[in-house]
Amino acid sequence: MQRLRWLLLLIVVLVIGASFVLVKLPLQLGLDLRGGAQLTIEVQPTKEIPQIDNDSLVAVKTVIENRVNALGVSEPLVQTAGEDKIVVQLPGVTDPGQAERILGGTAQLEFQQQRPGTEGEFQAEYSIKRQLDAELENLRRSGASPENSDRLEELIKAKEESNKALLALFEPMGLTGKNLTDARPSPNQSGTAWEVALRFDEEGGQKFAELTQAVAGTGRSLGVFLDNDLISAPVVGVEFANTGITGGAAVITGNFTIDTANDLAVQLRGGSLPFPVEVVENRTVGATLGQESIRRSLVAGFVGLVLVLVFMAVYYRLPGIVADISLMIYAVLTLAAFALVGVTLTLPGIAGFILSIGMAVDANVLIFERTREELRAGNTLYRSVEAGFFRAFSSILDSNVTTLIACAALFWFGSGLVKGFALTLAIGVMVSLFTALTCSRTLLLVIVLSLPKVRQNPRLFCPNLSSVTAKS
């Protein structure tokens, strides 16, 4: 009995802890429940590869997945559509423009050295580029208008010409974004602006040292190009003329805000796209769909749960009421587990949760039927309850293990919503195993051992029991 009291205390503590978790860590909802951004990205062929094949599409999809993961979006969906398109769903994203900038940019980073004898021409071209960048930024902030649209188109063409002119003043040195191991936004030393801190691999660190050594003290710039756009052109001091900048680290400075620095860092961490892409659709999934889905799901789940609770109480009497209490404990513990693990609830995920409730009920049904068989065989109520749990254990364990194996296969080979379904079902199955074999058993045995009137009235467990010798 002492052991049962400790188990009962453990159950109470778990329920209180789970309730606290649910208050402090609200459940995350997926795109279909709370809205977000959905982008359709079209992969563009090149002169070298005029036809996009499946391998090319998968390569682009992998890079986009890396960028999405770097964004920190929970339960994203990235999947191919047709021969040259990729659909990206980002739950909870409130700035689809940022998502388009990060996912749509090729992000081909390259470090180049300025050619000797081009100092004067570079200063003139770089000044023009900065003026164009400033005017472009002002136009974008001022919003769309017919006049702005025409001027914006002119500025974009002028910037393309400026980029070509600047690119001709530099020469590649073989140092690209492929040599990066990390990229993070960070404030500069004065704390007044933002920059992007880079970390190179061993080969990249050596190349960066050679590149900085080549331009150190010459007055020529080290060009940092992103998609052939010169984003930074620092001059390396003469103190690095002998060894270059060693250590395998560098920073990209420029006119960065915290948002633009983070966007660039995310792109660089995700890797460059092997093909140019175009975002052909960028739409926001409204909250109305999410609210309607939540309402219908909650109604369906509530009605189903009430019917199950009523059936268990009517058909199984006292054990059924105990099972109902266990089911409520199960619901609290499972939702808390979802919050702790970071599960994002989608409609398929809710379906997995409801299915796991059915499996929890099934476990209790097996236990109570075995208990009734023991009572009909003439055993005492206490022994019948213990034997019922013991005899049902192997069947319950087998069914739950096979379900978990299926969940593992779905999670391993599936993607997106299928993974969400598998994860919620697996968590629900594991929690249901605990509640059925621990919570239900503990509550029943405490009632039987603590209440003599219950112990002497086995018909509370088996209504049509003819006669049973009630023993303490």
Curated annotation (Swiss-Prot):
Coiled coil: none annotated. GO terms for molecular function: protein-transporting ATPase activity. It is found in: Cell inner membrane. The lineage of its organism: Bacteria, Bacillati, Cyanobacteriota, Cyanophyceae, Synechococcales. PANTHER family: PROTEIN TRANSLOCASE SUBUNIT SECD, PROTEIN-EXPORT MEMBRANE PROTEIN SEC. The keyword Cell membrane applies. Forms a complex with SecF. Part of the essential Sec protein translocation apparatus which comprises SecA, SecYEG and auxiliary proteins SecDF. Other proteins may also be involved. GO terms for cellular component: plasma membrane. Keywords: Cell inner membrane, Cell membrane, Membrane, Protein transport, Translocation, Transmembrane, Transmembrane helix, Transport. InterPro entries: Acrflvin-R, SecD, SecD/SecF_arch_bac, SecD/SecF_CS, SecD_1st, SecD_SecF_C, SecD_SecF_C_bact, SecDF_P1_head. This is Protein translocase subunit SecD. The chain crosses the membrane at residues 7-27, 298-318, 326-345, 349-368, 392-414, 432-452. Gene3D superfamilies: 3.30.1360.200, 3.30.70.3400, Multidrug efflux transporter AcrB transmembrane domain (1.20.1640.10). It is a multi-pass membrane protein. The keyword Lipid metabolism does not apply. The gene is secD. Belongs to the SecD/SecF family. SecD subfamily. It comes from the Bacteria. Part of the Sec protein translocase complex. Interacts with the SecYEG preprotein conducting channel. SecDF uses the proton motive force (PMF) to complete protein translocation after the ATP-dependent function of SecA. Probably participates in protein translocation into and across both the cytoplasmic and thylakoid membranes in cyanobacterial cells. Pfam families: Sec_GG (PF07549), SecD_1st (PF21760), SecD_SecF_C (PF02355), SecDF_P1_head (PF22599). One of its GO terms (biological process) is protein transport by the Sec complex.
